A protein has these predicted regions:
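Conserved ABC ATPase signature
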Residues: 150-154, 158
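Catalytic Walker B motif of ABC-type/P-loop ATPase nucleotide-binding domains
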Residues: 175-178
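Conserved ABC ATPase "signature" region
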Residues: 72, 116, 124-145
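Hydrophobic anchor residue at the start of the ABC signature
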Residues: 164
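Conserved ABC transporter NBD signature motif
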Residues: 64-72
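Helix-to-loop junction immediately C-terminal to a conserved catalytic motif
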Residues: 56
Length: 245
């Protein structure tokens, strides 16, 4: 893999949460390429949440380099990283983080309110934010009868679709999903993953999906078992686990 062409680049990373003496994550190198569908899995405590926080610029490493779209996130202030993330990363959270006092459409277009880059994308393509939100919700099979409703009136599966539409609007180049299928049964989970991967591919985004459930890996083009590359947890690898690739 050509490190210079990677969309996301991590080198010689060490990270510990404040108040902890020992790192929870130590990586030699990790790259994510443009358009890649990457599945990262592992048990609780192996560093998945820490890795996502680094990839999205929520936190900075204690040592090493994180580059996203050629930008060294380690050189940015917290506020600058927040702005960068709003412009370039669509995040699907485990709990969705939808605002209960906004309608479905307003929750989706909220991502554009915080992102000049997403607004500029829509402007260049002569798209209105609400029209693009409606297109995405239609693609994600959310009935039009729900678009003006509060998200509190939606089922878990419907809320997921709203969260995905919010992540995708304005075509950010990176989509990160943090265990968004944990509350779903198997059939609903597979349908959701098919929708997510299809929409990410249609928009040309790289998709990074994190889970503890290795059964989901068939939906992705590249698989990483995090304890195999995290030097902090590598000594606890179950030899029967799928080899990272």
């Amino acid at each position: 893999m050509d490190f210079d062409q990677a969309l996301i680049q991590l080198k010689q990373i060490s990270f510990a949460w404040p108040g902890l003496k020992e790192p929870v994550l130590a990586l030699d190198q990790l790259e994510v390429m443009p358009g890649e569908r990457l599945f990262i899995y592992g048990p609780s405590g192996c560093g998945k949440s820490s890795l996502l926080s680094l990839l999205a610029g929520v936190v900075k490493p204690d040592q090493g380099q994180v580059r996203v779209l050629g930008q060294a996130l380690t050189n940015l202030s917290s506020a600058a990283r927040d702005r960068f993330r709003a412009d370039h990363v669509g995040f699907v959270f485990q709990q969705f983080n939808l605002l209960p006092y906004l309608s479905v459409l307003e929750n989706v277009t909220l991502a554009c309110d915080f992102s000049p880059a997403r607004r500029n994308y829509l402007k260049r393509n002569k798209l209105a934010a609400f029209d693009e939100a409606k297109r995405l919700l239609t693609r994600l099979n959310l009935p039009e009868s729900l678009w003006q409703a509060s998200v509190t009136q939606l089922s878990i599966g419907q809320q997921q679709r709203v969260a995905v539409a919010r992540a995708l609007i304005g075509s950010p180049p990176i989509i990160i999903a943090d265990e968004p299928t944990s509350a779903l049964d198997r059939n609903s989970r597979d349908q959701f993953l098919d929708l997510l991967t299809t929409e990410a591919e249609a928009s040309g985004a790289s998709l990074i999906f994190v889970s503890h459930d290795e059964q989901l890996q068939s939906h992705f083009s590249r698989i990483i078992y995090l304890p195999e590359i995290n030097q902090v947890t590598s000594s606890y690898i179950d030899n029967s686990s799928t080899t990272a690739r």
